[in-house]
Regions:
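A short, structure-level motif marking secondary-structure boundaries and short turns
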Residues: 2-5, 101-103
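Structural recognition of the conserved hydrophobic beta-strand(s) that form the central parallel beta-sheet
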Residues: 32, 98-103
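Loop/turn-to-beta-strand initiation segments
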Residues: 95-100, 127
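Conserved catalytic-core segment of NTP-binding enzymes
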Residues: 104-176
Length: 176
Protein backbone atom coordinates (compact mmCIF):
# COMPACT_ATOMS: atom_id res chain seq x y z
CA UNK A 1 0.00 0.00 0.00
CA UNK A 2 1.58 3.24 -1.16
CA UNK A 3 0.47 6.11 1.11
CA UNK A 4 1.38 9.77 0.64
CA UNK A 5 2.43 11.92 3.57
CA UNK A 6 1.03 15.01 1.87
CA UNK A 7 -0.24 16.47 -1.38
CA UNK A 8 2.17 16.71 -4.31
CA UNK A 9 4.62 13.97 -3.33
CA UNK A 10 4.50 12.31 -6.76
CA UNK A 11 2.54 9.26 -5.66
CA UNK A 12 1.69 8.09 -9.17
CA UNK A 13 5.31 8.42 -10.33
CA UNK A 14 6.42 6.28 -7.40
CA UNK A 15 3.67 3.73 -8.07
CA UNK A 16 4.77 3.44 -11.72
CA UNK A 17 8.40 3.06 -10.68
CA UNK A 18 7.53 0.42 -8.10
CA UNK A 19 5.50 -1.58 -10.63
CA UNK A 20 8.44 -1.44 -13.07
CA UNK A 21 10.98 -2.43 -10.41
CA UNK A 22 8.91 -5.38 -9.23
CA UNK A 23 8.38 -6.55 -12.82
CA UNK A 24 12.12 -6.35 -13.45
CA UNK A 25 12.61 -8.52 -10.37
CA UNK A 26 10.57 -11.19 -12.15
CA UNK A 27 7.30 -10.76 -10.27
CA UNK A 28 3.86 -10.69 -11.85
CA UNK A 29 2.55 -7.30 -10.71
CA UNK A 30 -0.97 -5.95 -10.44
CA UNK A 31 -2.05 -2.40 -9.72
CA UNK A 32 -5.06 -1.00 -7.92
CA UNK A 33 -6.14 2.57 -7.25
CA UNK A 34 -9.27 1.99 -5.14
CA UNK A 35 -10.63 5.53 -5.30
CA UNK A 36 -10.45 7.80 -8.33
CA UNK A 37 -9.26 11.32 -7.63
CA UNK A 38 -9.78 13.24 -10.85
CA UNK A 39 -7.90 16.44 -11.48
CA UNK A 40 -9.98 19.52 -12.35
CA UNK A 41 -11.14 19.22 -15.95
CA UNK A 42 -10.56 15.45 -16.18
CA UNK A 43 -13.29 13.67 -18.11
CA UNK A 44 -11.59 10.41 -19.08
CA UNK A 45 -10.40 7.43 -17.08
CA UNK A 46 -8.60 7.80 -13.75
CA UNK A 47 -5.02 8.91 -14.48
CA UNK A 48 -2.97 6.47 -12.39
CA UNK A 49 -4.95 3.46 -13.57
CA UNK A 50 -4.74 4.55 -17.20
CA UNK A 51 -0.99 5.25 -17.00
CA UNK A 52 -0.27 1.82 -15.54
CA UNK A 53 -2.52 0.14 -18.11
CA UNK A 54 -0.82 1.91 -21.02
CA UNK A 55 2.79 1.61 -19.84
CA UNK A 56 2.74 -1.89 -18.34
CA UNK A 57 -0.14 -3.65 -20.09
CA UNK A 58 -1.84 -4.25 -16.73
CA UNK A 59 -5.64 -4.21 -16.61
CA UNK A 60 -6.48 -2.82 -13.15
CA UNK A 61 -10.04 -2.74 -11.83
CA UNK A 62 -11.88 0.53 -12.44
CA UNK A 63 -11.58 2.71 -9.31
CA UNK A 64 -14.66 3.81 -7.41
CA UNK A 65 -15.73 7.37 -8.14
CA UNK A 66 -14.94 9.98 -5.52
CA UNK A 67 -18.62 11.02 -5.43
CA UNK A 68 -19.67 7.43 -4.68
CA UNK A 69 -17.06 7.13 -1.91
CA UNK A 70 -18.01 10.45 -0.34
CA UNK A 71 -21.70 9.53 -0.43
CA UNK A 72 -21.00 6.21 1.34
CA UNK A 73 -18.77 7.87 3.93
CA UNK A 74 -21.38 10.57 4.50
CA UNK A 75 -24.04 7.90 5.02
CA UNK A 76 -21.89 6.11 7.61
CA UNK A 77 -21.29 3.14 5.30
CA UNK A 78 -17.53 2.76 5.81
CA UNK A 79 -17.74 -1.02 6.30
CA UNK A 80 -19.77 -1.48 3.12
CA UNK A 81 -17.33 0.75 1.23
CA UNK A 82 -14.37 -1.30 2.44
CA UNK A 83 -16.12 -4.53 1.41
CA UNK A 84 -16.65 -3.10 -2.08
CA UNK A 85 -12.98 -2.12 -2.29
CA UNK A 86 -11.84 -5.54 -1.05
CA UNK A 87 -13.86 -7.19 -3.85
CA UNK A 88 -12.11 -4.99 -6.42
CA UNK A 89 -8.73 -5.67 -4.80
CA UNK A 90 -9.35 -9.41 -5.07
CA UNK A 91 -9.90 -8.92 -8.82
CA UNK A 92 -6.53 -7.12 -9.03
CA UNK A 93 -4.85 -10.05 -7.24
CA UNK A 94 -5.89 -12.69 -9.76
CA UNK A 95 -2.79 -14.12 -11.42
CA UNK A 96 -0.38 -11.72 -9.69
CA UNK A 97 2.41 -12.23 -7.16
CA UNK A 98 2.04 -8.72 -5.75
CA UNK A 99 -0.37 -5.81 -6.15
CA UNK A 100 0.68 -2.18 -5.80
CA UNK A 101 -2.21 -0.31 -4.17
CA UNK A 102 -2.11 3.47 -4.54
CA UNK A 103 -3.75 5.30 -1.65
CA UNK A 104 -5.70 8.55 -1.65
CA UNK A 105 -3.89 11.86 -1.82
CA UNK A 106 -5.03 14.46 0.72
CA UNK A 107 -6.44 17.61 -0.88
CA UNK A 108 -8.46 20.60 0.27
CA UNK A 109 -11.55 18.66 -0.78
CA UNK A 110 -10.41 15.26 0.52
CA UNK A 111 -9.03 16.07 3.95
CA UNK A 112 -10.25 12.64 5.09
CA UNK A 113 -7.74 10.85 2.82
CA UNK A 114 -5.35 9.81 5.61
CA UNK A 115 -8.20 8.21 7.57
CA UNK A 116 -9.43 6.36 4.48
CA UNK A 117 -5.88 5.19 3.70
CA UNK A 118 -5.56 3.80 7.22
CA UNK A 119 -8.81 1.85 6.88
CA UNK A 120 -7.83 0.60 3.42
CA UNK A 121 -4.39 -0.61 4.51
CA UNK A 122 -5.81 -2.38 7.55
CA UNK A 123 -8.71 -3.95 5.62
CA UNK A 124 -6.33 -5.23 2.94
CA UNK A 125 -3.82 -6.37 5.60
CA UNK A 126 -1.30 -4.49 3.50
CA UNK A 127 2.30 -3.60 4.07
CA UNK A 128 2.71 0.18 3.85
CA UNK A 129 5.31 2.28 2.09
CA UNK A 130 5.03 5.99 2.79
CA UNK A 131 5.90 8.47 0.05
CA UNK A 132 7.07 11.94 0.98
CA UNK A 133 8.68 14.89 -0.74
CA UNK A 134 10.61 17.56 1.12
CA UNK A 135 9.09 20.96 0.78
CA UNK A 136 11.06 23.94 2.00
CA UNK A 137 11.90 22.17 5.24
CA UNK A 138 14.96 20.89 7.02
CA UNK A 139 15.47 17.16 7.51
CA UNK A 140 14.21 17.26 11.11
CA UNK A 141 10.89 18.74 9.94
CA UNK A 142 10.58 16.18 7.15
CA UNK A 143 11.45 13.39 9.55
CA UNK A 144 8.78 14.57 11.97
CA UNK A 145 6.14 14.70 9.24
CA UNK A 146 7.03 11.20 8.04
CA UNK A 147 7.01 9.81 11.58
CA UNK A 148 3.61 11.38 12.24
CA UNK A 149 2.19 9.64 9.15
CA UNK A 150 3.87 6.36 10.12
CA UNK A 151 2.08 6.58 13.49
CA UNK A 152 -1.25 6.36 11.67
CA UNK A 153 -0.26 2.90 10.43
CA UNK A 154 1.09 1.62 13.76
CA UNK A 155 4.37 3.51 14.00
CA UNK A 156 7.74 3.27 12.29
CA UNK A 157 8.57 0.03 14.12
CA UNK A 158 5.35 -1.72 13.08
CA UNK A 159 6.25 -4.66 10.81
CA UNK A 160 3.56 -3.54 8.33
CA UNK A 161 5.34 -0.18 7.84
CA UNK A 162 8.12 -1.11 5.42
CA UNK A 163 9.65 2.33 5.05
CA UNK A 164 9.50 5.62 3.22
CA UNK A 165 10.40 6.71 -0.29
CA UNK A 166 11.59 10.30 -0.58
CA UNK A 167 10.68 11.80 -3.92
CA UNK A 168 11.60 15.16 -5.46
CA UNK A 169 14.75 15.44 -3.34
CA UNK A 170 16.98 18.40 -4.10
CA UNK A 171 20.68 18.94 -3.37
CA UNK A 172 22.14 18.49 0.10
CA UNK A 173 22.53 22.24 0.49
CA UNK A 174 18.80 22.81 0.09
CA UNK A 175 18.01 20.20 2.77
CA UNK A 176 20.44 21.45 5.45
Amino acid sequence: FIAPTDFGVGLTSISLGLVRTLERAGLKVGFFKPIAQPHPGDTGPERSTELVARTHGIKPPVPLSLAHVERMLGDGQLDELLEEIIRLYQQACIGNDVVVVEGMVPTRHASYAARVNLHLAKSLDAEVILVSAPENEVLSELSGRVELQAQLFGGPRDPKVLGVILNKVRTEESMA
